[in-house]
Structure formats: C-alpha cells, structure tokens
Amino acid sequence: MLADWAGVPLGWMLGPAFVGLLLAALNNPIGSDGPLGNWGRGLLGASVGGMLQSEHLLILINAPELLLVTGGYVFAAGFVGWLWLTRVCGWQSQSGWYAALPGGLSEMVELTRQAGGRAYEVALAHALRIFLLLSLAALAVAFVHEGSWSGFALPPLALSDALMLFAVVWVGLVLGKRIRLPAHSVMGPLLISALLSFVLDWHLSVNEPLVIVAQLAIGWSLAHRFQGSSFPQIRSGLWQITGMLLCLIPLWVLAAWVVMILTEHGLAVMLLAFAPGGQAEMALIALLLGASPALVVTLHVLRVVLILSFASRWYPGKNR
C-alpha cells in the first residue's frame, strides 16, 4: 500500500516482494500467501484466458519459424547464463543450468531436484530474477509512461460476470492441480476461461480491485520464496543474478526484435513475452499496459513446454 501511495509502478506487487526480501535478510519469518496466492494468480489466469483468440493459436501454426527462434533463445539464454553462474560465480553445474534457463520457477526447481542439483539455490535465483525484472519493468514504466498505467482502462465488472469469474477460477484451480498442469494456479483457470471464450464467446475480465488482489497475491508469493535466505545469500545472489541478466539482455532484445518482425506485433509485447522469467508477472504487466497479455502468456507457455521437454537433453555439462 505504501509503495502504491508513493506512486511506485507495480507498487501492490513490488511492495510485498520488497518487504519479504527485507524480512528474509533480517532473518525474520515470512508468512505464506496461502489460498490468497492461488486465487490471485487464478484471477489473472482467467482474465488472460478470456482474451485468448484463435489468432493467438494460429500464430504458432502460421509462423513455424517462431518455434525455432524460441528454442534458440531458450538454449542460448540458458547456455550464457550457465557459463556466467558456473565459470564466474562458482555454481555447481546442474544447479547453474536450471537457474539460468528462462522457465517457470516451480518447474525449474522440480527439474533441479530430479537432476540431483541444489534446488534451494535455484529457487532463490529465480525469485531474485523475477524481483529484478519487476523492478526493471517499474523503472521502464516510470520513464516511458511517467509512472502511470493510464494507457489501458480496465472495464467495469457486472455481478453476473464476477460470479462466473470466481466459478471459473475455482474449477480451474481444482482441475489444474488434479491433472498437474505447470503453474496450475494460472494455467488451470486460463484453460477453463479460454474454453468459454472459444465455445461460448464469453470473454471474462477483471476490474481494478481484482487486479490489485492479483498484484498482492503475486507479490507476497514472491516474498515467501525468500523464506529462509540469509543476508549473505541474498547479497551474493543479487549481484550474481544481476550480472546474469546483463549478459542475457542482448539475447532477450534480439529474440523479441526477430519475433516482432515475424508476427508484426509491437516490441513491448515481445519484450514481455521473451522476458527471462516471470510468466504471471509479465502477463499482469501486459494486462495493465494493454499489451496483448494472451499472446505474452502463449509464448511463455511455449517456452516452458520446450524447457520441460528438452532441458535435460540440452544440458551442456552432461559430457564433462
């Protein structure tokens, strides 16, 4: 609340995340986001799913080169980040690979566990990466939009639509967990909402109070990821991940620029779509800016699918 009152872009999300980082550095407990976190991310997923149109799926069919660019970006970003973390920062090889890949936090932690790496280090690295990316996005908004999100007005929400929205989120959360979807709290409601959009032409959306709830939920969920981290771990993690992101910026911008040309979508959309981490966070920023959040999520999901399918095969240290 203080961050929003002070005029900080993304204040409702960055504020809780910063408090969590501070509490962890001071060795204080951080409460879990609990059901609120799932519901907040579910509201975002349902809203994005309601914006999905056939063109977002056809783009993957009509532009097969998009798959090559995305795959190339994933491997190149992972390889460059892996070199930085293992050669410069002294990370263990397996952990460095999964910490460097631009995939979902939960998925990367699970892959690290399966590979016998240090899952805790990977979790902290991805949490810090998302925090730094959000801070960078807030600075960019403050610079380009003078701290305002006025470029996109959220529509009012009728009572019937609100009831349907909450029903979709509930069903999506249950179904997503049951069938073990990646990032189930986002993807479950997103798929149910997208189905309603395609079949019944019923496009669900959120209003400003619900977006604030989503920001709070995502921010506190990120804050909870810092639980158990010491000040030295956070300090060293910040400079290591900052250095890695600086190494990835040229690849990030190049991939976004190439896909912008292939798809004729704006550069802002592609920068959010190819941001090296933070699917829910980047989708929320896209929603607030009116920058095609459905397409942003589509490309993030494509990236996660590629990583889950090929991460172990692409691991550059397997023959070492």
What are these regions (language model features)?
Residues 116-164:
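Alpha-helical transmembrane segments and their cytosolic membrane-interface
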